[in-house]
């Protein structure tokens, strides 16, 4: 289909103001990298997401979902087809010991809402820079806690635009993985069941975790967060440190000297710089320790034309 025809048909199913054409994506990612999206849509209702996904399915148009871009690298060639930003689905509702949140809400804000209502169980998320949708997608966790510990259910959409409600068990939450990834679903909403707690104790725990995070992580630079999954029996950051790779730089991206598990954009780095550095670190760690590192960060999009 011609680009103008797709635009016309999209305008017929969702409000025109949520549609952008050839939208630069670098401003939506923590790494500050990325090319353009053919169509960038920011739905404000679940029904919008369903309509867009169903349209894309019936017209064989690829769909990519974005949260707040904290654990993703988008290549400079951009993303073909439709990109759906879920950030406008950011509601947070608290009732008794339960919180229901839209996919686009920051998990940090959900953690704070729990604290404000004297609910414990989400303290671990007080420093995770991701959206609820992304947190469920990868079973986000930190400091001994993870989404799996407290999520009740997630409302999802499949690739046909159909609604599916999945319980904690049905989500198949594992280390940085879930059925959402495996079946290419998208999370619209998640519900968490928490426990009553002492608000001062909850705040003290969050303060402690925040202090630990700020002292160890290179928050002063753009980054994609933790780059690699934890290999069985090892810590990725320790392996990278022992391989003397801290400070190693490709283009404008380097392995953080503050925390070896992070790669930071120190000087106008590109997605290609990130990808090349990831591959280099994997190669060296494999050679030195015979351990294979698997990226935790998602790398998506097209390579720029000059690299094809």
UniProtKB/Swiss-Prot annotation:
Q: Which residues form the FAD-binding PCMH-type domain?
A: 32-197
- The enzyme class is oxidoreductase
Tell me which EC number(s) this protein carries.
Answer: 1.3.1.98
PROSITE patterns from the entry? FAD_PCMH
Give, as in the UniProt entry, the pathway in which the protein acts. Cell wall biogenesis; peptidoglycan biosynthesis
Q: Where in the cell is it found?
A: Cytoplasm
Query: Do you know which InterPro entries this protein is assigned to?
Result: FAD-bd_PCMH, FAD-bd_PCMH-like_sf, FAD-bd_PCMH_sub1, FAD-bd_PCMH_sub2, MurB, MurB_C, MurB_C_sf, Oxid_FAD_bind_N
> What is one Gene Ontology biological process annotated in the Swiss-Prot or TrEMBL record?
peptidoglycan biosynthetic process
Reactions catalysed according to its record? UDP-N-acetyl-alpha-D-muramate + NADP(+) = UDP-N-acetyl-3-O-(1-carboxyvinyl)-alpha-D-glucosamine + NADPH + H(+)
Q: Is Cell wall biogenesis/degradation given among the entry's keywords? A: yes
Q: Where is the active site?
A: 176, 226, 296
Cellular component terms per the entry's GO annotation:
cytosol
Gene Ontology molecular function, alphabetical: FAD binding; UDP-N-acetylmuramate dehydrogenase activity
Give the required cofactors. FAD
Q: Which SUPFAM superfamilies match?
A: FAD-binding/transporter-associated domain-like (SSF56176), Uridine diphospho-N-Acetylenolpyruvylglucosamine reductase, MurB, C-terminal domain (SSF56194)
Ribonucleoprotein as a keyword of this entry, yes or no, is no
**Alphabetic keyword roster:** Cell cycle, Cell division, Cell shape, Cell wall biogenesis/degradation, Cytoplasm, FAD, Flavoprotein, NADP, Oxidoreductase, Peptidoglycan synthesis
Q: Briefly, what is this protein's role?
A: Cell wall formation.
Q: Which HAMAP family does this entry report, sorted A to Z?
A: MurB
Q: Hey, which family's this protein in?
A: Belongs to the MurB family.
Q: What protein is this chain from?
A: UDP-N-acetylenolpyruvoylglucosamine reductase
| Organism per entry | Staphylococcus saprophyticus subsp. saprophyticus (strain ATCC 15305 / DSM 20229 / NCIMB 8711 / NCTC 7292 / S-41)
The organism's taxonomy opens as: Bacteria, Bacillati, Bacillota, Bacilli, Bacillales
């Amino acid at each position: 289909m011609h680009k103008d025809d797709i635009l016309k048909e999209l305008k017929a199913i969702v409000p025109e103001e949520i549609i952008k054409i050839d939208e630069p994506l670098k401003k939506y990612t923590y790494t500050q990298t990325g090319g353009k999206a053919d169509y960038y849509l920011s739905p404000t209702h679940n029904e919008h997401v369903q309509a867009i996904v169903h349209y894309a399915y019936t017209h064989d148009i690829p769909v990519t979902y974005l949260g707040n871009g904290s654990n993703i690298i988008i290549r400079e060639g951009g993303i073909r087809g439709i990109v759906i930003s879920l950030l406008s689905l950011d509601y947070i509702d608290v009732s008794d010991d339960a919180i229901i949140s839209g996919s686009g809400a920051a998990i940090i804000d959900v953690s704070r809402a729990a604290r404000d209502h004297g609910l414990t169980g989400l303290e671990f998320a007080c420093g995770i820079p991701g959206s609820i949708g992304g947190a469920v997608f990868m079973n986000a966790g930190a400091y001994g806690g993870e989404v799996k510990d407290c999520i009740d259910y997630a409302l999802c959409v499949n690739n046909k635009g159909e609604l599916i409600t999945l319980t904690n068990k049905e989500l198949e939450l594992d280390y940085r993985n879930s059925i959402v990834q495996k079946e290419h679903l998208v999370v619209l909403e998640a519900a968490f069941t928490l426990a009553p707690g002492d608000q001062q104790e909850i705040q003290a725990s969050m303060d402690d975790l925040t202090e630990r995070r700020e002292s160890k992580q290179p928050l002063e630079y753009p980054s994609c967060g933790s780059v690699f999954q934890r290999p069985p029996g090892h810590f990725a950051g320790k392996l990278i440190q022992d391989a003397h790779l801290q400070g190693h730089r490709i283009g404008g991206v380097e392995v953080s000297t503050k925390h070896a598990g992070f790669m930071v954009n120190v000087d106008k780095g590109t997605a290609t710089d990130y990808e090349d550095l990831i591959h280099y670190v994997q190669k060296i760690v494999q050679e030195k320790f015979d351990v294979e590192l698997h990226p935790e960060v998602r790398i998506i999009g097209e390579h720029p034309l000059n690299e094809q």
